[in-house]
Amino acid sequence: MGTDWEVKEVTGIASALLGTADIVADPAGLAADFTRMMETAMGKEVADVALRLWTPVGTTVKFVKQVAPTVEELTGRRTEAGPRAGDYPTGSWGDESRDYHVCVEVPAANLGQEMLAARVSLVIPEPGGTVQSLGAQGLVRAVWTDDMAASTSINPQVAHYTGQAELAQVIQQGLDLRKAGDIDGATAKLGRAVQLAGASGNADTAKLLAKVVDVVDAAAGTVRLKAKVEEADEMTLETRSTKTVRVKK
């Protein structure tokens, strides 16, 4: 509540607990915010859910991250779960959906070959090494081809969430550079953020950015840093920078 706190400390705690953080800049909004928070907490029905990733011999996991509704890096939080499998914590779930981005590297093979590169499922690890399956499973397929169009085109969902992850990163970098007095660096990073927010349809983040920069050309990422920025506006942008929007249907 208010602005007498460090954003990175609070968001770091929220990330460690697989939760979320937000700001209540105006104390008048505390009651409504607390009500929403309690409704969300009471709506959580399943606790300690893990994303289990199995990969065959020779396959390397490059990264695992949540990309919606917020960006959350999970790669370094893996716990081994048997031969070729690992669990990545996702916390408690209610009636909701989340999107994850998994990247694996497979060994070389001949043209026309196909293999199962990974199997993803949602489970609840239990004492004694047993596990409760939640019935959700996805298969990652790798195919070797010389079709340049197929091998070089990026899946629209992957492209979208790669942009959303970059958006969160450049906002953080831009605000850090602004605090450090690097005007040119901050302008470049926040300009890129405006460009990404506009391209992905992230209107909420675009509005928050507009309180920190004057937008000259959103499509080109041309902006000017505002001479005076309210501390609450800057903290709100930083706190909510990891919130994403889903791919447009």
Where are these regions (language model features)?
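General structural signal for secondary-structure boundaries
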Residues: 1, 26-29, 135, 151
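Acidic, polar loop-rich interaction surfaces within structured domains
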Residues: 3-127
